A protein has these predicted regions:
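C-terminal effector-binding regulatory domain of bacterial HTH transcription factors
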Residues: 34, 160-165, 169, 179-254
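A ligand-binding cleft/hinge motif common to bilobed small-molecule-binding domains
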Residues: 146-171
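Alpha-helical segments flanking ligand/cofactor-binding loops in enzyme cores
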Residues: 70, 96, 146-147, 201
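Short beta-strand->loop
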Residues: 69-72, 169-181
Length: 254
């Protein structure tokens, strides 16, 4: 029985197409050799109803009510830098120190206040705060900053999946263990009411599997908490459970 065939036309933002999707297309084609791919890269919304595009891959919320989304993955953002930068400028141990470092920032990842620019970061206990940064460069697309970060120009807040290949080869290191930035939702978007074709379903299911695998890899190699913090938190929780057990026992006995 033959599988999906023909042309699959999809649109994706530039940086995501380059960093997230292109590395996966060889494996997808090996799995579905009868499918041909037409990738339209654009940072602008594409008219899915009036065009021949089968599916759009988009980041963030879905403001258009004529469209429906299937969530492909959710990616953490964390602070990364090159070993060269860290050896020359040191490693921040707390987000308060970021204002004294060279920062390369993506506009959608920071908050702009009247008198300062901040990164919203969450600690391992779920508490979120805005920490001042003094970016030497900002861009609307993370791929514009990645080359500079890899060459030791500064620190950046990036998604796990974008950083993964460079973490694997040792070109990037995560800093500020225990702190994460906003989570990025990645969705497959279709016109409401359109039946999903076999070729689109195959592509979407493939992306869910592969992107989840990448996210799982980074959860292991760059956990939200460093091992010492996680062990301390587990010990604290265990102590609280013991105390609660003693309290209940005392109430029963008393």
């Amino acid at each position: 029985q033959s599988g999906p065939r023909g042309w699959l036309r999809f649109t994706v933002p530039y940086s995501i197409g380059i960093a997230w999707i292109s590395p996966l297309l060889g494996a997808f084609h090996a799995q579905y050799p009868e499918l041909r791919l037409d990738m339209h890269m654009s940072n602008d919304p594409v008219d899915l109803i009036g065009s021949e595009i089968d599916v759009a891959l988009r980041v963030g919320t879905l403001p258009d009510s004529t469209l429906v989304a299937r969530r492909l993955a959710g990616f953490r953002t964390q602070v990364f830098g090159s070993p060269d930068y860290i050896s020359r400028h040191g490693e921040p141990l707390h987000p308060d120190e970021l204002q004294h470092h060279r920062i390369l920032a993506v506009r959608k990842h920071y908050h702009s206040h009247p008198s300062r620019i901040t990164w919203p970061l969450t600690d391992g206990n779920g508490g979120t705060a805005d920490f001042p940064i003094n970016p030497l460069m900002v861009a609307n697309d993370p791929s514009a900053l990645l080359g500079a970060v890899l060459h030791g120009e500064g620190l950046t807040l990036a998604t796990d999946v974008a950083a993964k290949p460079y973490v694997e080869e040792g070109a990037l290191r995560r800093v500020l263990a225990g702190w994460t930035g906003p989570e990025v939702d990645f969705n497959a978007v279709f016109p409401r009411g359109r039946v999903m074709s076999p070729k689109v379903r195959a592509f979407v299911d493939f992306l869910v599997e592969r992107l989840s695998s990448n996210a799982d890899y980074m959860m292991v190699h760059c956990p939200s908490r460093c091992p010492m913090e996680a062990a301390a938190a587990a010990q604290l929780q265990a102590g609280e459970e013991v105390r609660e057990g003693k309290r209940i026992l005392e109430e029963v006995v008393g």
